[in-house]
C-alpha cells in the first residue's frame, strides 16, 4: 500500500531507558516530524505506511514488560480513505480501537 498514515502519539514512563528505546524505534521505522517533550510526557507526530505497523511495535514493547509505568497512545489516520485506528498500551496490555 502506498497510502501514508499520519500518527499522533503520547508517551509516559518513569524509565528514561524505555522512553529512549521507543523513540528510537519510532525514528528508525517511521518519519518522526514533531517531538514535544515535557516533564510528565512526550507528545509527537510521525508518518508511517498504512496500515500502521502495530505488530512490530507490539514486539518491541513486549521486550520492555518490566515497566509498569509505561503508557503509550497512538492514533493513526489516513484522510484519503478515512481510516482511523487507536493503539493504547497501559498497565502491561494493548488495547486496539477501530473507527
Feature annotation, model-predicted:
Residues 1-28:
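Short, extreme N-terminal segment that most often corresponds to the first beta-strand
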Residues 21-99:
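Charged interaction segments
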Amino acid at each position: 500500500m502506498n497510502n501514508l498514515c499520519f500518527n499522533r502519539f503520547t508517551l509516559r514512563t518513569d524509565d528514561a531507558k524505555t522512553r529512549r528505546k521507543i523513540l528510537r524505534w519510532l525514528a528508525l521505522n517511521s518519519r518522526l516530524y514533531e517531538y514535544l517533550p515535557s516533564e510528565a510526557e512526550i507528545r509527537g507526530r510521525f508518518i508511517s505506511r498504512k496500515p500502521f505497523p502495530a505488530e512490530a511495535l507490539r514486539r518491541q514493547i513486549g521486550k520492555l514488560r518490566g515497566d509498569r509505568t509505561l503508557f503509550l497512545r497512538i492514533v493513526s489516520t489516513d484522510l484519503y480513505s478515512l481510516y482511523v485506528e487507536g493503539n493504547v498500551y497501559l498497565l502491561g496490555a494493548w488495547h486496539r480501537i477501530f473507527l
